[in-house]
Curated annotation (Swiss-Prot):
Binding site for NADP(+): 14-20, 39, 48, 146
Taxonomic lineage from the root: Eukaryota, Viridiplantae, Streptophyta, Embryophyta, Tracheophyta
Role description: Reductase involved in lignan (-)-hinokinin biosynthesis. Catalyzes the enantioselective conversion of (+)-pinoresinol into (+)-lariciresinol and of (+)-lariciresinol into (-)-secoisolariciresinol. Abstracts the 4R-hydride from the NADPH cofactor during catalysis. Has also a low phenylcoumaran benzylic ether reductase activity.
Signal peptide: none
Binding residues annotated for substrate, in chain numbering: 274
Name of this chain's protein: Bifunctional pinoresinol-lariciresinol reductase
Subunit structure of this chain's protein: Dimer.
More about this protein: Knock-down mutants of PLR_Lc1 show unequivocally that (-)-hinokinin is synthesized via the (-)-secoisolariciresinol/(-)-matairesinol pathway and not via the piperitol/sesamin pathway.
Oxidoreductase listed as a keyword: yes
Active-site feature positions: 142
Length: 315
């Protein structure tokens, strides 16, 4: 398919979401002709409408299309060189990963898309074949989409961005918390398993760097900034340094975590399973990544936000 040029036309699907709006901004900032797909039936969701209008005022093109209307999807993807999908894969919101199978069909029919980046942006599902129920559904569904992409011979890049900083750092790696306490923290296990934390704006910036890079064609791009590979204890230590105070610490054993998880509803259990694999098993750091697949090595011009810098906003 060859490499793309800097004027590649980009379609973002899910562009009003938590990561999607950052992808739209990164695409515009990079100078791409940017298209944002939205459903025809927005209703009275005023915040979504205002966000779409703000994209338009910044130079983006709004494209009306629906997963329930195959022809509209084909028409939408026919406008661009690159399709980035950021629809939700989070069960506590709306788990929509398999909707992308309709998108794969549309891209295959259109025949013009030079790169497709499906909704991934977390743990690499190809490495989670032994994941626990019920959380493994996220990885299983993403692998179904991957197989469909590859069987359709659609050029792709998968982005594994690990832990969103807003969710993990904001709560000091504690599930169900997105603001750091100044008094107490619960350490998962001994708090020494390392995770990888990435500012969502950096995820978007690295993603847009990758879309026209021949080095990332038909590969997985891992975003693992070296300074952000830290244990929960290290994250807490940085926060304590910022506030000039030691937190009271409680340890939560693996057994107690799993017992508490079983008392939650299905959607909560899915998310907690992911915390379990990251914070008790170290699933993000138990393998090596080739330098030509790691974003901060490929794109040293992107100045990523460190954990220390990120946590300062909460002081």
């Amino acid at each position: 398919m060859g490499s793309l040029n800097e004027s590649s036309k980009v379609l973002v699907i899910g562009g009003t979401g938590y990561l999607g709006k950052r992808l739209v901004k990164a695409s515009l900032d990079a100078g791409h002709d940017t298209y944002v797909m939205h459903r025809p039936e927005i209703g009275v969701d005023i915040e979504k409408v205002q966000l779409l209008l703000s994209f338009k005022m910044q130079g983006a093109h709004l494209v009306s299309a629906s997963f329930d209307d195959h022809r509209s999807l084909v028409d939408a993807v026919s406008l661009v060189d690159v399709v980035i999908c950021a629809i939700s894969g989070v069960h506590i919101r709306s788990h929509q990963i398999l909707l992308q199978l309709k998108l794969v069909q549309a891209i295959k029919e259109a025949g013009n898309v030079k790169r497709f980046l499906p909704s991934e942006f977390g743990t690499d599902p190809a490495r989670m074949g032994d994941a626990m129920e019920p959380g493994r559904v996220t990885f299983d569904d993403k692998m179904v989409v991957r197989r469909a992409i590859e069987e359709a011979a659609i050029p792709f890049t998968y982005v594994s961005a690990n832990c969103f900083a807003g969710y993990f750092l904001g709560g000091l790696c504690q599930p169900g918390s997105i603001l750091p306490s100044r008094d107490h923290v619960t350490l998962l296990g001994d708090g020494n398993q390392k995770g990888v934390y990435v500012d969502e704006n950096d995820i978007a910036a690295y993603t847009l760097k990758a879309i026209d890079d021949p080095r990332t064609l038909n590969k997985t791009l891992y975003i693992k900034p070296p300074k952000n590979i830290l244990s929960q204890r290290q994250v807490v230590g940085i926060w304590e340094k910022h506030i000039g105070k030691q937190l009271h610490k409680t340890l939560l054993s693996e057994q107690d975590f799993l017992a508490a998880m079983k008392e939650q509803d299905y959607a909560e259990q899915v998310g907690l399973t992911h915390y379990y694999h990251v914070c008790y098993e170290g699933c993000l750091t138990n393998f090596e990544v080739e330098q030509d697949q790691e974003a901060s090595k490929l794109y040293p011009d992107v100045r990523y936000t460190t954990v220390e810098e990120y946590l300062k906003r909460y002081v």
